[in-house]
């Protein structure tokens, strides 16, 4: 009887506990957690989430309940940011099996109840559930939007180590202790940590290419690399180190330190030197070098190496304490020094951040210009830039040395000193210098203030060129004093053009780097037999090979057919009548050109010269054929055939110019063409005999340049050219037949393709000459 009463009591207690747990679970309201109404829009929900996440993030809020509060905020945002889960919650009070926070809490507490009262603890303490197993992973959990918007951009400054896990994963449990130990060490060094639950974030796991759990991968500069070795502490540490580029830190010795420190002028960066007691470069220093690779060049000196005594003695370095030096324009004396027995990452980063620019940096890109000369936000945040416009030299010039010494003596928070190579940034320099001719070959100094991001600036330029004399320094100092008293002292206003990126790699190098990355990815996939990821690449390669093979075969057969057809065509060719002037298509070409097709070719005369060239609309070009009265018919026919396929472009116009009438105009243009045939003078006896027939000029009237096509000389033409010129006074013994005239324009279609591609050389002229 007592046993029955005891059993009833236990059952009643179980039911009571379950009811209480359910009621407590109902307290979780995502709308109340985020502080929004049930009719709130997605924008309001996102805004509230960002505000609360910043306030309750465990790294920023030291409140003991901050972590639990942050988890509730994240769960609430997961429910309300997904329309389907939000609808489920509004109708049923639950967001689904994957996201129901109250369900997870209920299951957790229900299991806890059974563990204490009914079942063996050794069974139910086995950590199958990911959330129960490691609550420390909660703050590292990644969602797809978080990965795309934050992790990927941040990976260009620091590498990320990401673990892919799931529920009911025995191997995940096995690697957990090693993972915790590695995370604790690497996170302190600056490595980003992430955890992806494959059950809840299938889209992100698929995006990362993780098809099994557990998986560990690294993300750096947007590139994903998988870890394939045994999960031990040393292997994971080496894996993170292998993600970093190999040329981040240069080993500096007594033999190369002068060359290393002298690179500031070419690289336009300060140089950092760390003196350490270990032969290998510390990982923390490599991570710092990666974060600031765009601003500072890093070197490492092992103090235990023979021959470094001269360096340590010159810079007064303590051999028993880690020391970091920053060098700028002067290599004999460091600009800043930090020395501590235990250099922490935050201390190093603050030290580098304060010294990431030279004393007078060179403006090599628009991004650097925005950073050094920011747009003013208020009257108290005015930033002025003193710009030295000077010519590029191999050695430091006297004007620049004087400018540097002036900058060192007049360093202020509101004034930044920079310099520009005027020969590399000509448009930028010409905007600031009022009279370029007066400053030709000389240096000038301007003081400017940016007003908006569109390039609008106000500035004041020193009237005389900058020589670095004491009088120049006195004048510049007076300008700065007047500027502090009256900001309206900068009286000139202009819109500066964007700076060209001087240090950007050329196209060939970018292409080479891309090919190298593809090859390394392919080799890694091949080694580890990741065929699922390799299939798109293999499909692309085989498709390209198939297309290439098909193109070669088609070209081979078409060439052989053309050769067979060309022989009878040559035999049937009949010279054209001399009196025919209109272009007509031959029988051979009629198969290639539609019957109703025609090419409109107008003559370039003094009447049509202005409309067809001088006032031609921007973006339009006039393709002009040079011919003579005797070659007009034949050349126009061939010209029409060659350019017919390009007549679909409305920006191309076609004309011809008679050499007998306008020879002087043509020879004036050819004087501006590089590698063109030398232009004879009027006293040369062969002056009027030079043959320009078959030349084609593509004239851009708006931008005042032209491209030149010169026909290749055939064997018959060379024979004609070798004839005695005196024979031309009598009956000529040799002349141009139809074959040479036909061959003059044989390569014109290829030239036209290059013209449309924009790969032809352009010859600029100051103005279009008169057409007499």
Curated annotation (Swiss-Prot):
Glycans are attached at residue 629. The keyword Mitochondrion does not apply. Residues 560-591 are annotated as: Disordered. Residues 26-533 are cytoplasmic. GO terms for cellular component: endoplasmic reticulum membrane. Residues 119-245 form the Thioredoxin domain. The chain crosses the membrane at residues 534-554. It comes from the Eukaryota. It is a single-pass type IV membrane protein. Residues 29-93 form the J domain. The keyword Ubl conjugation does not apply. Residues 561-580 have a biased composition (Basic and acidic residues). Pfam families: DnaJ, Thioredoxin. Residues 1-25 form the signal peptide. PANTHER family: DNAJ HOMOLOG SUBFAMILY C MEMBER 16. Plays an important role in regulating the size of autophagosomes during the formation process. This is DnaJ homolog subfamily C member 16. The gene is Dnajc16.
